[in-house]
Amino acid sequence: ESLVENNIINVSSGSKITDVDSITIGFIPVEKADELTSKAEVLEKFLESELGIDVEVVVPTNYETIIEGMRFGHIDAAFMDTGPAWITHQRTGAEAVLAELVKGKVNYQATVWTLAENDSINTLEDTVGKRVAFTSITGSSGFVRPMGTLVTEGHIAIEGDDIVALEQALANNFESYTFAGGYKAALNLLLNGDVDVAFGSDIAPQKYLDLEDQVKLRPVVTIGPVPSHVFMVSSSMSESTKNNLVDALIELNYDEHNSILTNLYGAEALVPTTTTMHIGEFGTFIDVLTGLDQKILDKHDKSK
């Protein structure tokens, strides 16, 4: 009793007891692990000093390694892209606890672009039946958000439950559709008159086009946010370990440790979040686009 009274034993909810002697953290898959591994190891040392336990870092070549690792308890937490994070949540029950802050935001906006002189396209629904350019089938703002919205709002129906059904829905609902390969390529198809619409991000024209080309385009509509990278923890991690890990990672937001974070993925800060708050709505678009989950995982497979 006296130990508690004298504050020698801390019984508050913010208890600093980490009930495991080691944790393993996964990173976004890369082709050449060496470059990222050295940066990840700086984080490893930092977390070891903050938590007082052994921390292992794993830089895989694909997300399946992380998903299986989380499912079977070999990986406790991981930095992830939005799409794979949602798939991991669906398959293993892992939860997002932190979101990356990039240029002051935890998301960017998916936007529909057309030529300034084209007055026939004024809503997302107006793109149905037109010649459209997506970035890629796994592109968040360039495909998942616009196509997912068209499906959830009932403008396009997918008959079936696989990637073939999704591709058939595209063929049935657009005069033509192209996966251009990126923002710039999609915008160039639009500028060249090959398509009526290009899907992408809110800042794609100013980032990839000269001013004289930027003025030839207009944003039709902003469809909604695409969430930033997240930090996920496994469903089996205890509350106390999770809280301590989150607290330690938030220390990276302060000047003295911030370079550890910015060197990893260019994020300025990590902010607390939940799966539902950060990815929830975006996740529903992945779910309705049949067969897309495997495409998303394949896209990030750097071993192939």
Annotate the PLM regions.
Residues 29, 109-121, 226-241:
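A bilobed periplasmic-binding-protein/Venus flytrap-type ligand-binding module shared by bacterial periplasmic
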Residues 2-27, 31-38, 42, 232-304:
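An extracytoplasmic/periplasmic, membrane-proximal ligand-sensing/linker region
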Residues 101-160:
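A conserved helix-loop-strand patch within extracytoplasmic ligand-binding domains
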Residues 79-92, 146-152, 184-216, 225:
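A ligand-binding cleft/hinge motif common to bilobed small-molecule-binding domains
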Residues 64-78, 91-92, 125, 169-171, ...:
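Short helices/loops that flank or line small-molecule/ion binding pockets
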Residues 43-52, 142-179, 207-212:
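Ligand-binding cleft/hinge of the Venus flytrap
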Residues 26-29, 59-63, 73-92, 98-101, ...:
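Beta->alpha turn/N-cap motifs
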